[in-house]
Every structure is written in C-alpha cells, then in structure tokens.
C-alpha cells in the first residue's frame, strides 16, 4: 500500500455512546488523543466537530469501519459509515475509512485502559486507527 499524503486529520472511533477522537499534525509526525465526544443529536455533535476542525485546521477525516473477522460489513459498520459520510459532507472534508477490527481491544492492552467510561479508550482506539492510516492509507476521498 502507498502511504497517504500527510495532512492534519481527525481519526474517529464511532460508537453508539461516544466518539473517540485523535488528531495529527500537518506532517503526520505526532498523534494526539483528544477528548471523546459523548453522543447527542447529530446537530450537537456537528457543532463540537466544527469547533475542533476549526481549531486544529483539519483537512480530512478518518473513520473506523468495524468489519467482522471476514472483512464483511456489520450493522455497526453500516451505522459508522452513514455517520462518517454525513459528518464529512457537513464539514466539507474528504474522508477515508479504515478497518477498525479489534482496535478497541488493542487500545485497552496498549494503554492499560480497562472498564473506562470516560472515553479515553475510544480516543486511544482512534489514535491506533490514525497511526494505521498514516502507514497504510487509503488516500482521503472528497467525493462523499
């Protein structure tokens, strides 16, 4: 796989209760865990993302896609894709999806976060997705 062009992106681990967030600098060198968003109405979520994107000068979104062990879509992956596409359209940002299978389990082990209800585990999972995207891609797609 070809590495994507580095830029300031947000990586999202979209769950039913929280959205974990991680961001990187424009050169793709450092990854920062950001506070998770506790889900509300889409409009309220959007306002929070608009502020984060403005403050960080975000150029694209990476969304985790929780495929099953065979790489097939699940009910949750369909919900995540719908949310990610809607968010990217509203923010006018290009978007890429990355398979997030087991990212939360990996985050729990890597960062010793168990039984977390604060959203730190979700943002840690988003950071793992972002690290994976910086290495493997795919490129951001602005046709959403």
Swiss-Prot record:
Q: Which UniProt keywords apply?
A: Cytoplasm, Hydrolase, Nuclease, Ribosome biogenesis
Q: Biological process GO annotation list?
A: rRNA 5'-end processing
What's the chief localization of this chain?
A: cytoplasm
Q: GO: which molecular function terms?
A: nuclease activity
Q: Which CDD domains match?
A: YqgF (cd16964)
* Gene3D superfamilies listed in its UniProt record: YqgF/RNase H-like domain
Q: Cite the EC number.
A: 3.1.-.-
In which compartments does the protein localize? Cytoplasm
Top-level enzyme category: hydrolase
User: What Pfam families does the annotation carry?
Assistant: RuvX
Per the entry, what this protein does is: Could be a nuclease involved in processing of the 5'-end of pre-16S rRNA.
Family from the record: Belongs to the YqgF nuclease family.
Q: Check the record and name the HAMAP family matching this protein.
A: Nuclease_YqgF
This one is known as Putative pre-16S rRNA nuclease
Which organism encodes this protein? Prochlorococcus marinus (strain NATL2A)
């Amino acid at each position: 796989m070809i590495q994507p062009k580095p830029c300031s992106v947000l990586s999202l681990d979209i769950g039913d209760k929280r959205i974990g967030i991680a961001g990187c600098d424009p050169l793709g060198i450092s990854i920062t865990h950001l506070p998770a968003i506790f889900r509300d109405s889409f409009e309220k979520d959007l306002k929070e993302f608009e502020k984060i994107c403005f403050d960080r000068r975000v150029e694209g979104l990476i969304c985790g896609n929780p495929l099953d062990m065979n790489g097939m879509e699940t009910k949750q992956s369909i919900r995540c894709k719908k949310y990610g596409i809607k968010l990217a359209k509203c923010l006018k940002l290009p978007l890429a999806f990355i398979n997030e299978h087991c990212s939360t389990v990996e985050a729990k082990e890597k960062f010793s976060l168990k039984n977390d209800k604060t959203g730190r585990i979700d943002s840690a999972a988003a950071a793992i997705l972002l690290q994976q995207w910086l290495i493997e891609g795919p490129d951001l797609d602005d046709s959403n």
